C-alpha cells in the first residue's frame, strides 16, 4: 500500500538531531481565518516514493518470469489461546502447534466431523505461549531494517473477529517513563525501535505519522476531531500509475516515540468499536497507521534506483520510506455475532471488503489478467502491498478452539494462497532537501499567518455551517476550473485538427484545378480526332453496303461450318464416353483378375491344408491299424502258450492217474485173489480218478472256450471299428476332393464366361468407336474440301472490297479454324490408335488367360481322377483284408470250439465205458474170480491202450491249435504287408497331388509397355456462332454504321490469340477447316 497523504499543515524545522515539530494551535468551537490568507489544505509536491507504476487492469503475468529481486509475501500465523468463556464452556482444541514458535500447525477436528487432520506450513507460526515481544522481534523488527534502508513496507493483521488482531497491532498503549508495558502491540514497539535506530545512526531525519480508518467504505481521519474532520478522497496519481493520493488526511510530525504513541492513543479512542456476542470490543472498521521517514543519505552510499554513488557533496539528498501498519476488521457471522440494524450493516461492509481482498489474492495467485483492486477502497489502499513494489508481511490470527474451526480453516486457506503472491520491492528514489524544505516553509508561513490573525482577531468569524458551505463552494469551483481546463485542452486539439483539415482541403482544390485544365486540353484534342473520324466514316459508309451483302453469304457459310463443327463435337464427346467406358471396363477386368488370383491362391492354400491334414490323419489311422495287428499277434501267441500249458498240465495229471492205475494193476497181478474189499477199494480209487480227470478236462475246456471267445470277439469288434473309421476317412477325403474340384471347375467356368464377355464388349465398343470416328472423318473431309473451294473464291472478292483490315481478320479466322481442325483430328487419330492397341492387348490377354485356365482345368481333372482311383483301390483292399481277417478269426474260434467238444465227448465215452466195465467187474467178481481176473487184465491192457489214445488225442488238438496260430500269424503278416503297400501308394499319390498343386500357378501377363496409359482427354471444344459483325440489311442507319466501325476497329487491334479450348472465333473455324483438309489428304495417301 502506498497512499501519498497531503499534509494537514504544521510547523517544522530541521535540526541536527532531527526535524522537530510544533503542534498546531486550533480553536475547537469556531473557525477563525485570516482574510488575507485563508487557511486551506494544499496538495504536497510530488515525491517519488518508489510506488509501482500499475493500473487496475495490469496482470501479474507481466512478472511471470520471476526476477531475483522478487519476494513472496511473508505470512506469519499467531494462534490465540482459549478465553475464560471458552474454558468455562470446556471447548476442545482444534489447532496444535510445535511450541511457542515453529513453522507448521495442524488442524485436528473432533470425531463427529468429516474433516481430517491437515497440516499447514508458513514462514513462522506462533503458539499461544508466544508473547508480544517474541512476535515483534521475529516478524516486525526485520521489516524496520528494510524501512531504514529505503523500502516501503506493509504489515497487516488478518483473521476472524475476536482472534486478537487489534491486541496484536496496538495492544496496551500505556507507558511509564518511556518504558512499554509487557502487553504493548507491534505499532508501539515499532515506534520505539525506529527512533532508537535513528538516534543511534547520528543522521538527520524527519518522521511523520497519519492514522485513519475505513468505516463503511468511507475514509475517516483519526488524528483530528469529528468537528474538524473533512471528507477524504482517493485519487489516482497521474504522475505514477498504480499509486493513490488521499486528500483530507492530517499528517503530524513527531520527534520521538512518545509523540507517536500519543497520536496512536488519540486515534484509537476515535476508532469505531462495538460489543458483539463474539467480542466485547470488536473493531468495526479497518485502520491504517502510516509512518513516513525522510532520512539524509550518507556519503559513500549507492543509490540502487538511480545507479549512482553518493559523494561527500550530497547534503541535499534525502531518502523517503514508509511503514504501513494495518489492522483489518475481522470477518464474522451475523448469526453468531448477533449484529442487528447498524451493526449488521457494518458487518456486511466488512465482509464485502474482506471478500474483495480474497478475490484479489486469488487473482494474484492465479495470475489473472484483471485484478479487482477497484471493487473496494480497502484493496485500492492495499494495491501496492499486494503484488507491487512494497515488502509485505501478513500476520494471521486464528482461534485454537473447535467452535471456530470453520472460520479458522477458511482463514488459513486464504493465508496459504497469499504466500504465493510475489512482490518486487524497490528502493525509493532520492529526493532533494529543497523540495521538502519548500513544502515546510510554505506550511510555516501559512501557520504564522493563521496564528497572527487569531491573536489579533483580524479575520472573519463564520458559523460552522456557513464555513462548510463556503468551503464546499470553493472545492466545487476548483473542480469546475479543472473541468474547464480539460475542455479547453480538448478545444485546442479540435482547432488544431480543423486547421490541418483546412490545409489538406486547399491542397486538394489546387490539384483538382490542375486536373480540370488537363481535361480541357484533352477535350480539344478529342474534338479534333472526332472530326477526322467523321470524315473517315463517310468514306466507309459507301463501302459498308457492299460488305453487308458479302457478309450475308459469309454468315450462311458460317452456319454450315457451325453445323459441321457441332457434329464433330458430338462425335468427339461420344468417343470420349466410349473410351471412358472402355477404360472402366479394363479397370473392372483388372480388379476381377486380381480378385480371381486371390481366390486361386486361397483355394490352393486350402487344398494343400486339407491334403496335409488328411495325410496326417491317414498316417495316424495306419499306425493304429499296425498297432492293432501287433496286439492281435501277441494275443494269439499268448493264447497258444496258455492252451499249451493247460494241455501239458492235463497230460501230466492223466499220466499220473494212469501211473497210479498201473500200480494198482501190478498189485492186482501180484495178488489175484484179493478179497472183495480190495476190489471195492480199487473200484473206488478208479472212480475217484475218473472224477478228477473229468473235472480237470472240463475246467480246461471251459478256460479254452472262454479265452477263445473273448479273443475272437475283441478282434472282430476292433476290426469292424477300424474298417468303419477307414471308410469314413476315405469318404470325407473323396467328398473334399470332389468339392474342391467342383469349386475349381466353377471358378474356371466363371472366368471363361467373364473373359468372353469382356472380349465381346471390347470388340463391340472398338467397332462402334472406329465406325463413328471414320464417319466423322469422312464427313469432315468432304465438307472441308467443298467449303475450301467456295471459301477461297469468295475470299479474294472480300479482300479486294474491304481492304487490308478485313483481309487480316479473315486470315486470322482461317488460321484459327485450321488449327482447331488439326487439334481435333489429332485427338481423333490418337483415340483411334489407342482403341486399336487396347483391343489387341485385351484380345491377347484374354486368349492367354483362357489357355491358362483350360490347361489348369486339365491338370486338376487328371489329378482328381488319379486321386479318386487311388482312394477307391485303397478302400477296396482295406475291405477285403478286413473281411479275410474277420473270417479267419471266426473260423479259428469255431475250430477251437469243435476240438474242445470232440475231446470232451471222447473222454466222456471212455469214462462211461470204464464205468460199465468196473460195474461188471464188481458184479461178477465173486463168481468168476479167475475168469474175471484174466478179463480184468485184458481190460487193464485195453485201458492202457485207451490211455495212450487219449494222450494222443489230447496232443492232436495242441498240434492243430499250433497250426491255426501259425496260419493266423501268416495272415496278419500278409495283411500288414498289403497295408504297407497301400500306405506307400497313398503317400505317393498325396505327395504327387501336393506337388502338382504347389507347382500349379497363374500365368501372369508380360508387361510390354505398349499399352496406352489412362489419361485425361481435353475438354470438348465448344463455340457459339459469332454474329456480332453481321448486321441486318434492314433498318440500317448511321449509328449502327458507327458502332460497326468501332467494333471492327477494336477487333482488328486485338493481339491476344483465343484459347484453343475456349469459345472459338471465326478464325478458329477457318483453322479447323484447314486442319481437317490436311488430315483427309493424309488418310487418302
Swiss-Prot record:
InterPro entries (alphabetical)? KIF11-like (IPR047149), KIF11-like_kin_motor_dom (IPR047241), Kinesin_motor_CS (IPR019821), Kinesin_motor_dom (IPR001752), Kinesin_motor_dom_sf (IPR036961), P-loop_NTPase (IPR027417)
- Keyword Manganese, does the record have it? no
In its UniProt record, which GO terms are filed under biological process? cell division; initial mitotic spindle pole body separation; meiotic spindle assembly; microtubule plus-end directed mitotic chromosome migration; mitotic spindle assembly; mitotic spindle elongation (spindle phase three); mitotic spindle formation (spindle phase one); mitotic spindle midzone assembly
Question: What start-end ranges are recorded for coiled-coil regions in this protein?
Answer: 436-604, 715-740, 897-955
Positions with biased composition (Low complexity): 1065-1078
Question: Region (Disordered): which ranges?
Answer: 1-70, 1049-1085
Provide this UniProt record's keywords sorted from A to Z: ATP-binding, Cell cycle, Cell division, Coiled coil, Cytoplasm, Cytoskeleton, Microtubule, Mitosis, Motor protein, Nucleotide-binding, Phosphoprotein, Repeat
Q: Which residues carry this modification: Phosphothreonine?
A: 1011
Q: For this UniProt entry, what's an example GO CC term? A: spindle microtubule
Q: Which domain of life is it from?
A: Eukaryota
Q: Which GO terms describe its molecular function?
A: ATP binding; ATP hydrolysis activity; microtubule binding; microtubule motor activity; minus-end-directed microtubule motor activity; plus-end-directed microtubule motor activity
Question: What ranges does the record list as Polar residues composition bias?
Answer: 24-37
Return the PROSITE patterns for the record. Answer: KINESIN_MOTOR_1 (PS00411), KINESIN_MOTOR_2 (PS50067)
- According to the record, where are the sequence repeats? 987-998, 999-1010
- List residues binding ATP: 159-166
Kinesin motor domain spans which residues?
72-421
- Can you say where in the cell this protein is located? Cytoplasm, Cytoskeleton, Microtubule organizing center, Spindle pole body
The similarity comment for this entry is: Belongs to the TRAFAC class myosin-kinesin ATPase superfamily. Kinesin family. BimC subfamily.
Annotated function: Could be a spindle pole body motor. On transition from G2 to M phase of the cell cycle, the spindle pole body duplicates; the daughter pole bodies seed microtubules which interdigitate to form a short spindle that elongates to span the nucleus at metaphase. Mutations at cut7 block spindle formation.
The entry's protein name is Kinesin-like protein cut7
> What does the organism's lineage look like at the top?
Eukaryota, Fungi, Dikarya, Ascomycota, Taphrinomycotina
UniProt gene name: cut7
Amino acid at each position: 500500500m502506498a497512499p501519498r497523504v497531503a499534509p494537514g499543515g504544521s510547523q517544522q524545522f530541521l535540526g541536527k538531531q532531527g526535524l522537530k515539530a510544533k503542534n498546531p494551535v486550533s480553536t475547537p468551537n469556531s473557525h477563525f481565518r485570516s482574510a488575507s490568507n485563508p487557511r486551506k489544505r494544499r496538495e504536497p509536491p510530488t515525491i517519488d516514493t518508489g510506488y509501482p507504476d500499475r493500473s487496475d487492469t495490469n496482470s501479474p503475468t507481466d512478472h511471470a518470469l520471476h526476477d531475483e529481486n522478487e519476494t513472496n509475501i511473508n505470512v506469519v500465523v499467531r494462534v490465540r489461546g482459549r478465553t475464560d468463556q471458552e474454558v468455562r464452556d470446556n471447548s476442545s482444541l482444534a489447532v496444535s502447534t510445535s511450541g511457542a514458535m515453529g513453522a507448521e500447525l495442524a488442524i485436528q477436528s473432533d470425531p463427529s466431523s468429516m474433516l481430517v487432520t491437515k497440516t499447514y506450513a508458513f514462514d513462522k507460526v506462533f503458539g499461544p505461549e508466544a508473547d508480544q515481544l517474541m512476535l515483534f522481534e521475529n516478524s516486525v523488527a526485520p521489516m524496520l531494517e528494510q524501512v531504514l534502508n529505503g523500502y516501503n513496507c506493509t504489515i497487516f493483521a488478518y483473521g476472524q473477529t475476536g482472534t486478537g488482531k487489534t491486541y496484536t497491532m496496538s495492544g496496551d498503549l500505556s507507558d511509564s517513563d518511556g518504558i512499554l508495558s509487557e502487553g504493548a502491540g507491534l505499532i508501539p514497539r515499532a515506534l520505539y525501535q525506529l527512533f532508537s535506530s535513528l538516534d543511534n545512526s547520528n543522521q538527520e531525519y524527519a518522521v511523520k505519522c497519519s492514522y485513519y480508518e475505513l468505516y463503511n467504505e468511507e475514509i475517516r481521519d483519526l488524528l483530528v476531531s469529528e468537528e474538524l474532520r473533512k471528507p477524504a478522497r482517493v485519487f489516482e496519481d497521474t504522475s505514477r500509475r498504480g499509486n493513490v493520493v488521499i486528500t483530507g488526511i492530517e499528517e503530524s510530525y513527531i520527534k520521538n516515540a512518545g509523540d507517536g504513541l500519543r497520536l496512536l492513543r488519540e486515534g484509537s479512542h476515535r476508532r469505531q468499536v462495538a460489543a458483539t456476542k463474539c467480542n466485547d470490543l470488536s473493531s468495526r472498521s479497518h485502520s491504517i497507521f502510516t509512518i513516513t521517514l525522510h532520512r539524509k543519505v550518507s556519503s559513500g552510499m549507492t543509490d540502487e534506483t538511480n545507479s549512482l554513488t553518493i559523494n561527500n557533496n550530497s547534503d541535499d539528498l534525502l531518502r523517503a520510506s514508509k511503514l504501513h501498519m494495518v489492522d483489518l476488521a475481522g470477518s464474522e457471522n451475523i448469526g453468531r455475532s448477533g449484529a442487528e440494524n447498524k451493526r449488521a450493516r457494518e458487518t456486511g461492509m466488512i465482509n464485502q471488503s474482506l471478500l474483495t481482498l480474497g478475490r484479489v489474492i486469488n487473482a494474484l495467485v492465479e495470475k489473472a489478467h484483471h485484478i479487482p483492486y477497484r471493487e473496494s477502497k480497502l484493496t485500492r489502499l492495499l494495491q501496492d502491498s499486494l503484488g507491487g513494489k512494497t515488502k509485505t508481511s501478513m500476520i494471521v490470527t486464528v482461534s485454537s478452539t473447535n467452535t471456530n474451526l470453520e472460520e479458522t480453516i477458511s482463514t488459513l486457506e486464504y493465508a496459504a494462497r497469499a504466500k504465493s503472491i510475489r512482490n518486487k520491492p524497490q528502493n525509493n528514489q532520492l529526493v532533494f532537501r529543497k523540495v521538502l524544505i519548500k513544502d515546510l516553509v510554505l506550511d510555516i508561513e501559512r501557520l504564522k499567518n493563521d496564528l497572527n490573525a487569531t491573536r489579533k482577531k483580524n479575520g472573519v468569524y463564520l458559523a460552522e455551517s456557513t464555513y462548510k458551505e463556503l468551503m464546499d463552494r470553493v472545492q466545487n469551483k476548483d473542480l469546475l476550473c479543472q473541468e474547464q481546463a480539460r475542455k479547453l485542452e480538448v478545444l485546442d486539439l479540435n482547432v488544431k485538427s480543423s486547421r490541418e483539415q483546412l490545409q489538406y482541403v486547399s491542397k486538394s482544390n489546387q490539384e483538382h484545378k490542375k486536373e480540370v485544365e488537363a481535361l480541357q486540353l484533352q477535350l480539344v484534342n478529342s474534338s479534333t480526332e472526332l472530326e477526322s473520324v467523321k470524315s473517315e466514316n463517310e468514306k466507309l459508309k459507301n463501302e459498308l453496303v457492299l460488305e453487308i451483302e458479302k457478309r450475308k453469304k459469309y454468315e450462311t457459310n458460317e452456319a454450315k461450318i457451325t453445323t459441321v463443327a457441332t457434329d464433330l463435337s458430338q462425335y468427339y464427346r461420344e468417343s470420349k464416353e466410349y473410351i471412358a467406358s472402355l477404360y472402366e471396363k479394363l479397370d473392372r477386368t483388372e480388379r476381377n483378375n486380381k480378385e480371381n488370383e486371390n481366390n486361386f491362391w486361397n483355394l490352393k492354400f486350402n487344398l494343400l491344408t486339407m491334403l496335409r491334414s488328411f495325410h496326417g490323419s491317414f498316417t495316424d489311422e495306419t499306425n493304429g491299424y499296425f498297432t492293432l495287428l501287433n496286439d492281435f499277434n501277441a494275443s494269439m501267441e499268448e493264447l497258444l502258450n496258455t492252451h499249451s500249458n493247460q494241455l501239458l498240465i492235463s497230460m501230466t495229471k492223466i499220466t499220473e492217474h494212469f501211473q497210479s492205475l498201473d500200480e494198482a494193476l501190478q498189485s492186482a497181478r501180484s495178488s489175484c485173489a484179493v478179497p472183495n474189499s480190495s476190489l471195492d477199494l480199487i473200484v473206488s480209487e478208479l472212480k475217484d480218478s475218473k472224477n478228477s480227470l473229468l473235472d480237470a478236462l472240463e475246467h480246461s475246456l471251459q478256460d479254452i472256450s472262454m479265452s477263445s471267445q473273448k479273443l475272437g470277439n475283441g478282434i472282430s469288434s476292433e476290426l469292424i471299428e477300424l474298417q468303419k473309421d477307414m471308410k469314413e476317412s476315405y469318404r470325407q477325403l473323396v467328398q473334399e476332393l470332389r468339392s474342391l474340384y467342383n469349386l475349381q471347375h466353377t471358378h474356371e467356368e466363371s472366368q471363361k464366361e467373364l473373359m468372353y464377355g469382356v472380349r465381346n464388349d471390347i470388340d463391340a465398343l472398338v467397332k462402334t468407336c472406329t465406325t463413328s470416328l471414320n464417319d466423322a472423318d469422312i464427313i469432315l473431309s468432304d465438307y472441308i474440301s467443298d467449303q475450301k473451294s467456295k471459301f477461297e473464291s469468295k475470299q479474294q472478292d472480300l479482300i479486294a472490297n474491304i481492304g487490308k483490315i478485313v483481309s487480316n481478320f479473315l486470315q486470322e479466322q482461317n488460321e484459327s479454324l485450321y488449327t482447331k481442325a488439326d487439334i481435333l483430328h489429332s485427338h481423333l487419330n490418337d483415340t483411334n490408335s489407342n482403341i486399336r492397341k487396347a483391343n489387341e492387348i485385351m484380345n491377347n490377354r484374354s486368349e492367354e488367360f483362357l489357355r491358362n485356365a483350360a490347361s489348369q482345368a486339365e491338370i486338376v481333372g487328371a489329378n482328381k481322377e488319379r486321386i479318386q482311383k487311388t482312394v477307391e483301390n485303397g478302400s477296396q483292399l482295406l475291405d477285403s483284408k478286413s473281411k479275410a481277417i474277420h473270417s479267419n478269426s471266426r473260423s479259428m474260434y469255431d475250430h477251437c470250439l469243435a476240438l474242445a467238444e470232440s475231446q470232451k465227448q471222447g473222454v466222456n465215452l471212455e469214462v462211461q465205458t470204464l464205468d460199465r466195465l468196473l460195474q461188471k467187474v464188481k458184479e461178477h467178481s465173486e463168481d468168476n474170480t479167475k475168469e474175471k481176473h484174466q478179463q480184468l487184465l485184458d481190460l487193464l491192457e485195453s485201458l492202457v491202450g485207451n490211455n495212450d489214445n487219449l494222450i494222443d488225442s489230447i496232443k492232436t488238438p495242441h498240434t492243430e491249435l499250433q497250426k491255426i496260430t501259425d496260419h493266423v500269424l501268416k495272415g496278419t503278416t500278409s495283411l500288414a504287408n498289403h497295408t504297407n503297400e497301400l500306405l506307400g501308394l497313398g503317400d505317393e499319390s498325396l505327395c504327387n497331388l501336393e506337388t502338382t498343386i504347389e507347382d500349379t500357378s497363374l500365368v501372369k501377363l508380360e508387361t510390354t509397355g505398349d499399352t496406352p496409359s489412362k489419361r485425361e482427354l481435353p475438354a470438348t471444344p465448344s463455340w457459339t456462332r459469332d454474329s456480332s459483325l453481321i448486321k441486318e440489311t434492314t433498318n440500317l442507319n448511321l449509328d449502327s454504321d458507327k458502332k460497326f466501325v468501332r467494333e471492327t476497329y477494336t477487333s482488328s487491334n486485338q493481339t491476344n490469340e483465343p484459347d484453343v479450348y475456349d469459345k472459338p472465333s471465326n478464325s478458329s473455324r477457318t483453322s479447323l477447316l484447314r486442319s481437317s483438309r490436311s488430315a483427309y489428304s493424309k488418310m487418302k495417301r
